[in-house]
From Swiss-Prot:
The gene is gltX1. A motif ('HIGH' region) lies at residues 10-20. The keyword Transport does not apply. It is an enzyme of class 6 (ligase). This is Glutamate--tRNA ligase 1. The keyword ATP-binding applies. One of its GO terms (biological process) is glutamyl-tRNA aminoacylation. ATP binds at residue 241. HAMAP family: Glu_tRNA_synth_type1 (MF_00022).
Length: 463
């Protein structure tokens, strides 16, 4: 089997979005699964729209999710000399030609064609032109598209695709200022980089016949193509910013783990063994672009949150602390290692994102300044206050290094007072955490420690 070589080739005119990252992941997995090469190419030939910040953001996103590319990043803006050579080669071989048609002439032609209910297109008037070039017009360069031929290719996702070259006009490969066009530079670079397999969005499907024309004109080997359907929202519409079409790095800020995001995106449009959770090793073992779906996939926040919660629960306390560093939350330095582990173990089971986990740390460690009103109103204060006073005395005697001792202290109150567990547990939870829900009470007592637990009960009794 020949070496698999893939690439991801974004334009730095905006930040890397979720659909682009999915395409990059598919290319990465296919190359790595076959011990091949995966390249990153920045398509920055549109000098007026390029953004250095956007290019850097693409690189930053790659680093975050762990997509390591081979070799140096290839920037198309540094390769204009190469493109110029190949344009001249096509001109010299009479496979391309200068077109002197002005914009006004082209616009007029299109209007005439529309009036005749024809598809607007260039009419090849300069294809075999041998006369004196008109003055004052900087020509474009057009490729001579073979006439009355069928261009066919077997797309790995779409199946057999056929286009009659009569549907194509002699498209431009170099603008009047000499800069090459998109389809031309993509073809040149894919060929010179030895790309064997092109996995990209199906919005590029219409470009493929034009690129095949160029491959053939230059006697380049044509790669395999896989055109992946777009990602839709759950209503079947194009992704909007609200529905997930946002900068990839925003997902890091929202508290998603890279493992969860890669797993989620790899499953958008690809399936294997009815599994949902895939480690990187499993993705590399099972991924094959031939298994990509031909219909669009739907972005589901519910599924992403479920996956992220799964990965969050399986993180060690040490890694969680590293992952939590970008988020603001209470100081943890007063907790001993056992308390810290207990805090993170308790909260990661109740959190879907790192951001949510950071908020829940505050909910435990910051003493309540007010109490959940609907829970507070239901309390029988005449019963509750003596119970908490009695429990406070038990806590002062208790060994806070043993959670079972704390649990026994709570059950002792319930048994001695012959009351239902909720009659005591609910007000105790309100005193410690300020609300009716949250982590278990024995965990809360253990994490807060004796001094803080007693202090919070005393503050509650004052209210």
């Amino acid at each position: 089997m020949s070496l698999i070589v893939t690439r991801f080739a974004p334009s730095p005119t905006g930040y890397l979005h979720i659909g682009g990252l999915r395409t990059a992941i598919f290319n990465y997995l296919f190359a790595r699964a076959n011990q091949g090469k995966f390249f990153l190419r920045i398509e920055d030939t549109d000098l007026s729209r390029n953004s250095i910040e956007a290019a850097n953001a693409i690189i930053e996103a790659f680093k975050w999710v762990g997509l390591e590319h081979d070799g140096e990043i290839l920037y198309q803006s540094k390769r204009f000399g190469i493109y110029k050579e190949y344009i001249q080669k096509l001109l010299d071989e009479d496979k391309a030609y200068y077109c002197y048609m002005s914009k006004d002439e082209l616009d007029a032609l299109r209007e005439e064609q529309k009036a005749r209910k024809e598809t607007p297109r260039y009419d090849n008037r300069y294809r075999d032109f041998k006369g004196t070039p008109p003055k004052g017009i900087e020509p474009v360069v057009r490729i001579k598209v073979p006439q009355n031929e069928i261009i066919g290719f077997n797309d790995g996702v779409k199946g057999e695709v056929k286009v009659n070259t009569n549907e194509l006009d002699d498209f431009i490969i170099a603008r009047s200022d000499g800069t090459p066009t998109y389809n031309f530079v993509v073809t040149i670079d894919d060929a010179l980089m030895g790309i064997t397999d092109v996995i990209r969005g199906d919005d590029h499907l219409s470009n493929t016949p034009k690129q095949i024309v160029l491959y053939k004109a230059l006697n380049f080997k044509i790669p395999n193509f896989f055109h992946v359907p777009m990602i839709l929202n759950e209503e079947g519409q194009k992704l909007s910013k609200r529905h997930g079409a946002t900068n990839v790095m925003d997902y890091q800020e929202m508290g998603y783990l890279k493992e969860a995001l890669v797993n989620f995106l790899a499953r958008l449009g690809w399936s294997c063994h009815d599994k949902e959770v895939f480690s990187m090793q499993e993705l590399l073992k099972w991924f094959d672009p031939k298994d990509l779906n031909s219909s669009p996939s739907c972005f589901s926040w519910h599924k992403l949150n479920w996956l992220n919660a799964h990965y969050l629960k399986n993180q060690s306390a040490q890694r969680l602390l590293e992952l939590l560093k970008p988020f603001n939350f209470s100081d943890l330095s007063h907790l001993n290692p056992t308390q810290l582990d207990r805090l993170l173990d308790a909260l990661k089971e109740r959190s879907q994102t790192l951001k949510e986990l950071a908020l829940k740390i505050d909910e435990v460690l910051i003493a309540p300044v007010e109490y959940e009103e609907k829970v507070f109103k239901k309390l029988n204060q005449a019963l509750v206050m003596p119970l908490l006073e009695k429990f406070k005395l038990e806590l002062n005697k208790a060994n806070f290094n043993d959670e079972s001792v704390l649990e026994n202290a709570m059950h002792k109150i319930i048994e001695e007072e012959k009351i239902k567990a909720g009659s005591f547990m609910q007000p105790l939870r309100l005193a410690l955490l300020g609300k009716g829900g949250g982590i278990g009470l024995k965990e809360a007592l253990f994490i807060l420690g004796k001094t803080e637990s007693v202090k919070r009960i005393e503050e509650f009794l004052k209210n």
